[in-house]
Amino acid sequence: MSYESPQAAAVAWLPYSQLATDIDQPTLDWLFDEGSLTRRLTRLSIDHFSVTPLFEGWQPLRDDECQALGIAAGAEGWVREVYLRGHGQPWVFARSVASRSALERGGLDLETLGSRSLGELLFCDQAFIRHPLEVCTYPQAWLPSEAAHAALWGRRSRFERNGLDLLVAEVFLPALWQAAKEENR
């Protein structure tokens, strides 16, 4: 599936300290967990975790992504969109982006990840520094049509290693909340 993610006006990505809405504690725990989401999903799924690539390729990055990466608006970058699945169900929609120039400088080949988790790579390489998490109500227009629901929580953070910046956004889909609720029973 190849498509360009449309721009959405005025998306407010906020750190924990600036959230002005009441969010229940289990949701906050997922949104601001600084550990590996891949590992947490693997535990929740009792090792029935998988990654399904949806799109990988070069395209102009969204304005909010360019701003977060500190690059010019409309810059081209590598975009990777996947579903993180538990028991075959899409639990998380993830979009990872990096500018072309950063990838050329940073020596990381995202094109060869395939169905492997980017999170495994980021959390196994101690040289990557994770910047603070930010959250938003993720725009429905940015989601694949089969996952397009209103008012889904998304989070993102920037990972940095020797001049290579990657921006990773993760959107928590309804099936994840159901699985997490069942685990807590």
Swiss-Prot record:
Principal subcellular localization: cytoplasm
InterPro entries xref list: Chorismate--pyruvate_lyase, Chorismate_lyase_/UTRA_dom_sf
GO molecular function, one term: chorismate lyase activity
Biochemical pathway: Cofactor biosynthesis; ubiquinone biosynthesis
Cellular location(s): Cytoplasm
Keyword ATP-binding belongs to the record: no
EC annotation from Swiss-Prot or TrEMBL: 4.1.3.40
Family: Belongs to the UbiC family.
Name of the protein in its database record: Probable chorismate pyruvate-lyase
Organism whose genome encodes this protein: Pseudomonas putida (strain ATCC 47054 / DSM 6125 / CFBP 8728 / NCIMB 11950 / KT2440)
Gene name for this UniProt entry: ubiC
